[in-house]
Amino acid sequence: MLNTGDTIAAIATAIVPEQGSIGIVRLSGSEAVAIARRLFHSPNRQKWQSHRLLYGYIRHPQSQAIIDEALLLLMLAPRSFTREDVVEFHCHGGIMPVQQVLQLCLENGARLAQAGEFSLRAFLNGRIDLTQAESVVDLVGARSPQAAQFALAGLQGKLAQPIRHLRATCLDILAEIEARIDFEEDLPPLDHAAVLHSIEQVFCQVNLILATAERGELLRSGLKVAIVGRPNVGKSSLLNAWSRSDRAIVTDLPGTTRDIVESQLVVAGIPVQVLDTAGIRSASDRVEQIGVERSRQTARSADLVLLTVSAESGWTQEDEEIYRSVSDRRLILVINKIDLANPETVIYPAEIKRVVKLSAAQNQGIEDLEKSLINAVQNQELQAANLDLAINQRQAAALTRAKIALQQVKKTIDQNLPFDFWSIDLRTAIQSLGEITGEEVTESVLDRIFSRFCIGK
């Protein structure tokens, strides 16, 4: 574990050469204000007050050379993110100003912060719990408005509150059980039915929250979608129509697309990486052969395959062969060019359940494609959850452990086993729920969580 008694410093804003207008250097710790007083000089002798901006210059303490014109923000403990004294130098952006100011801070008593160390201190000092800390990372890395919305909900405690309530319920049940173990003769008999009812209520709530795990994974990682098919079925036209751009070259010549063309979209709040692939066919051209092989590899690694065929030519033997090679993937059949031919004449395998008929050239049917895509990746359990939550993999794993433990408690009660057996599994559930908020967590878990943060957070 890091030494939390040190005063730490880091650049808190992204460094963008010649573009960033503002750069922030952040300090946190008992020496933060003292370091700031050595470096910052206000021409009008302004009073140093918490949560007030001061205007002035950052000077080298020995040479008195001006390093930058800046604003200083003090946030004195405990009214700061870390609940320590926090100082921010708001400098000019770019590379040199913030790096020079950071170096001065380090030369005057601060230590360079490690990844996530500001947020770690906020957690250790009780300012935030683990779910809120993880939500900070999610908010910074959000790739869609919906992802940002769920991250903000987590930051506001929307996950921590129900988890704490469930854990408190389990603790109350455990207290009743252990009281019967220690003072059985002095207390009335335990109502088994009431205990079982409470356990089942907790179990149902755990299941509801677990149902948001798939949503969370989609919002954080996004969806990789591969457009595959034989040449000249309109794959590149589909990419262009969907992305509302001319990312891919479109011609009537087979084999025009020879490499993977990518576009980033957001569909119903989910980040989607759309990959237009080379037409799959037997090719004599070496370059085209490489493109075809890349198409097959992309299809195998995609979360969802859009198998694209032409309404003009119908379902061909080539389409059948391509379908058989990707039939084990999550798949949508896209019948393109419906402006040129009747799509009802396309006879495709009956086992294909998700079919979208569109015209990429006429920009028809794109909304239907997006609806089908969302239906393909979101199961009914997720849609039914309807919670303002999107848990991550760590939280889902802990909830799964709690769920298994609660199942075992129910089984133990049904089998009328001694109270000692009830308490063992109930303690496991309590510990697993505590791991989510950080009430019960190991140092190695903390290291793993906060190592994902950028320096300065």
UniProtKB/Swiss-Prot annotation:
Cofactor note: Binds 1 potassium ion per subunit.
Quaternary assembly: Homodimer. Heterotetramer of two MnmE and two MnmG subunits.
Protein name: tRNA modification GTPase MnmE
Listed EC numbers: 3.6.-.-
Organism, scientific name: Microcystis aeruginosa (strain NIES-843 / IAM M-2473)
Record-listed K(+) binding positions: N232, T251, L253, T256
Function (record text): Exhibits a very high intrinsic GTPase hydrolysis rate. Involved in the addition of a carboxymethylaminomethyl (cmnm) group at the wobble position (U34) of certain tRNAs, forming tRNA-cmnm(5)s(2)U34.
Similarity comment text for this entry: Belongs to the TRAFAC class TrmE-Era-EngA-EngB-Septin-like GTPase superfamily. TrmE GTPase family.
One example GO MF annotation: GTP binding
PANTHER family in UniProt: TRNA MODIFICATION GTPASE GTPBP3, TRNA MODIFICATION GTPASE GTPBP3, MITOCHONDRIAL
Chief location of this protein within or outside the cell: cytoplasm
Entry keyword set: Cytoplasm, GTP-binding, Hydrolase, Magnesium, Metal-binding, Nucleotide-binding, Potassium, tRNA processing
InterPro entries xref list: G_TrmE, GTP-bd, GTP-bd_TrmE_N, GTPase_MnmE, MnmE_dom2, MnmE_helical, P-loop_NTPase, Small_GTP-bd
Residues binding (6S)-5-formyl-5,6,7,8-tetrahydrofolate, per UniProt: R26, E88, R127, K457
Enzyme class: hydrolase
Positions bound to GTP: 232-237, 251-257, 276-279
Binding site for Mg(2+): S236, T257
